[in-house]
C-alpha cells in the first residue's frame, strides 16, 4: 500500500484532499506545518493560519478519517527562508511573493524530506493544480477551476518533487469541494479561505517589516523621471511598482510608482504609460519542460491574478528573457513570471 503525508492547514481544501486519498486506498497521516507563533510576529490568533483553532480543525478531520495526525515545527526554516527573504526583497526594492518561497522551501522541500525520513511515498496538498506524466517527464497543469488555479505559485517544483506529489483537487471546482466536505460532516466545510500572505493578514507589509526588523525606514523624496523633487515619501519599503493609492501627494493629475532609487532613497513617480514594459529578465528559473534550445512562443503571467499575455521566451545565459507581444503594465522586481502553453506550466522564475 502506498503511503502519503497530507499537508493539512485546517482548511476545507486539504481536508477533502485527505478524504480523497483515504478513499483511494492510501495509508495516510495528516501533518500541519507550524510556521510561526502569532504572538512572536505581532498578530492576533483569529486572523491567520497556524493558530490553535486551525490545528484543532485539522486534528478533528484527521480523527474523523481515522488518520494519525502530527504537527511539525518548521518555525526556524520559515523564518530563514520566507520571512527573512520577504524583508530582504522589500529592502532591495522588490515586491516578494512569500507563498512561492513557502512552497519551494517548506511544503516541497522540508516536508518532502520528512516524507523520506518516514519512508512515505507522497506529499499531498490541497492546491488547485494537477500533475501529468507524459513522454518520460512530469508536467504541471492548471487546475480545472480556473478561478482557483494555483499553478502560478508551484512553478518551482522539480521533477523529483512532481513525481512524489499528488494534487487530488486538480479536477474539481471549489464549490464541489465544499459540497464534499459538507456531505462528509467536516466542521470546516464553510470555513473562509486563508489569507494569501498568512503572516501579514491585515495587508500592512511595512508595519510588519518595521516591527519584525525592529527599525524604522527613513523618509525620502518622491521625484519625477528627471530627478525633480515632488514631495516626501515615508519609507521606501511602503511602495511597490504600479502603486497609486496611499502616496499622499497631490499634483493635479494621477501619478504612479514607476521605479525606486535605493542608493538615494528616492521613489520615482510617473504616468500610467511609464509603467509599461516590453520585456523582462528572470533569474532562478525552473524549467518544468525540458530546457528549450531556442526561442519559444508561449503565454506569460507576471502576477498571480493577471490574465496571461502572449510572449516569446528564450534562455539568456543562466537567466530567461521574456519579450511581450504587447507592453505589460507594472512588471515588478521580486515577483514571479510563469510561462504557460495552454493548460501546461512550462516554467517560471523571479523577475529581476
Where are these regions (language model features)?
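ATP-dependent adenylation/nucleotidyltransferase module used to activate substrates
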Residues: 1-155, 166, 175-176
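AMP-forming adenylation/ATP pyrophosphatase catalytic core
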Residues: 126-131, 136-352
